[in-house]
Amino acid sequence: MTRRALALLGVIALIVTAFPMLDGSSASRASGVFAGRVHETFQPSDGKIYILVLGSDERHGNAQRARSDAIHIVGINADTMRGGILNFPRDSWVDIPGYGSAKINEAMHRGGPQLLARTLENLTGIRLDYWVLTGFQGFEGLIRRIGNVPITLKRDIYDPGGSGARLEAGRRRLSSWKALAYVRTRKAFKDGDIARTSNQGRFLLQMLKLLNKQVEKDPSAVFKWIAAGREFTDLNIPADETFRLSVLATQVGAGRIGNVTVPVSIGSVGASSVVFISPRATALYSRFRKNASLR
């Protein structure tokens, strides 16, 4: 297997074990985690790999036809081992192929992850390789397996009527339910979902730091991540390959991955509150498309 292919699967393994998101989805397994190809064949361009990472708002029913509350493109350049997380607020007003203009989270409801992928490909000009869809049912189990997640909060986060978050500012180690509350919180922030989507990207980076730290201290810790990933996901990767990929994932330093939310302005369409993506995003897409990195 080529280094580039290994890098792709390593990143997928990392995301699936390290970034459960938001409101839940039903599945045959506890997690409600699904993954698939955007196109029939995987054809990375010059070592650049792009994965669409989604969180569903569905607690019961078909998670793949629910509205997406978390929308991120993760890019990795397998040659430079740099990357980026490009975040899209769920209320972004975009053109959905075959349906006209609507909030971006409507795309998955209309046509599943594939339609949302097409929507983002048209918007950004980036050819996506894989999609990963997560729910929250396996989230707490994953955190319990791999350990509390260290993070520094610049302010108190209090959201009793929404996510249930009651988090004090400062250096914290988030337990499973506190971590879930953190990535779900929007009502506690003035800019709502814009802050939430940025925090989701930040949480992924904190998970990567935790993985790096644990494996640096004890290389056998990678088995704990593998076990958690295999228990809580529907990604079919053989155990021996999962091991190789997880080891590779530890080589991607969080400091080499940028976390950027597309620039937007708040507005309305009819009675609906939406956000409009700024024309300034065009340069951001071009940079990400060229380098698969936001660092």
Label each region the model flagged.
Residues 1-295:
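Non-catalytic, solvent-exposed segments at the cell envelope interface
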